Amino acid sequence: MTHQTHAYHMVNPSPWPLTGALSALLMTSGLAMWFHFNSTILLMIGLTTNTLTMYQWWRDVIRESTFQGHHTPTVQKGLRYGMILFIISEVLFFTGFFWAFYHSSLAPTPELGGCWPPTGIHPLNPLEVPLLNTSVLLASGVSITWAHHSLMEGNRYPMLQALFITIALGVYFTLLQASEYYEAPFTISDGVYGSTFFVATGFHGLHVIIGSTFLIVCFFRQLKFHFTSNHHFGFEAAAWYWHFVDVVWLFLYVSIYWWGS
């Protein structure tokens, strides 16, 4: 920062975008190998390289922001715009799944029996595990807001407490979703109902796992005093992402579990 006369961060060459792209290729190819040939070797290599990339990329960003002071207010403003655009792209991603669901359910074809849910499909009761999942995610939305306000007010321990509760609720949601999948009376191959249900809720579940990972990183950073009341964009981005995951679940619950059943 001492050798430049502007507030922007000139990023050093980094291998992580390349290794991230390679891990994405390995994971998608590995999924195809797993589905068609029951081999998980390529998938495991992809997951390993993805985990290593995430760890090292996060480490570099933390070093640049917390220890080298590259994240000036101008840089943080750019990062905020980037996060907003990323969340908008995620909204459009899920819009595709809702479009597929409503396209199939509002005008069911004769092949589906002319009704929704299709003939032979027994949907899950929206007042059982799905309602509990909704309560869990809404509670986590409250606790992440509590953590954010505690951080802005400089209350370190209440922030850690609230963040830990949020992470615990996120993990609990994932376990509930896994048990629901295990006990579901239909599969992803049971026509358009199974496909839209498992792809939409499955991708949401993946986003919950990503969000939980993001929050775990923030928890350990807070333990090491990385955040201050006016310099905590890493946590702020995680909180925005978590609220997005909350809102998507509400739409999923109302559309697929409640109305769709």
UniProtKB/Swiss-Prot annotation:
CDD domains: Cyt_c_Oxidase_III
Mitochondrial intermembrane side stretches: 35-40, 106-128, 184-190, 257-261
Main location: mitochondrion
GO-annotated biological processes: mitochondrial electron transport, cytochrome c to oxygen; respiratory chain complex IV assembly
Membrane association type: Multi-pass membrane protein
Catalysed reactions, as listed in the record: 4 Fe(II)-[cytochrome c] + O2 + 8 H(+)(in) = 4 Fe(III)-[cytochrome c] + 2 H2O + 4 H(+)(out)
UniProt-listed Enzyme Commission number(s): 7.1.1.9
Keyword Transmembrane helix: yes
InterPro entries linked: Cyt_c/ubiquinol_Oxase_su3, Cyt_c_oxase_su3_dom, Cyt_c_oxidase-like_su3, Cyt_c_oxidase_su3-like_sf, Cyt_c_oxidase_su3_a-hlx
Gene Ontology molecular function: any one: cytochrome-c oxidase activity
Compartments where found: Mitochondrion inner membrane
Alphabetic keyword roster: Membrane, Mitochondrion, Mitochondrion inner membrane, Translocase, Transmembrane, Transmembrane helix
Mitochondrial matrix face of the membrane: 1-15, 67-72, 153-155, 224-232
A single cellular component GO annotation: mitochondrial inner membrane
Coiled coil region boundaries: none
Subunit structure of this chain's protein: Component of the cytochrome c oxidase (complex IV, CIV), a multisubunit enzyme composed of 14 subunits. The complex is composed of a catalytic core of 3 subunits MT-CO1, MT-CO2 and MT-CO3, encoded in the mitochondrial DNA, and 11 supernumerary subunits COX4I, COX5A, COX5B, COX6A, COX6B, COX6C, COX7A, COX7B, COX7C, COX8 and NDUFA4, which are encoded in the nuclear genome.
Protein name: Cytochrome c oxidase subunit 3
Source species: Raphicerus campestris
Gene name for this UniProt entry: MT-CO3
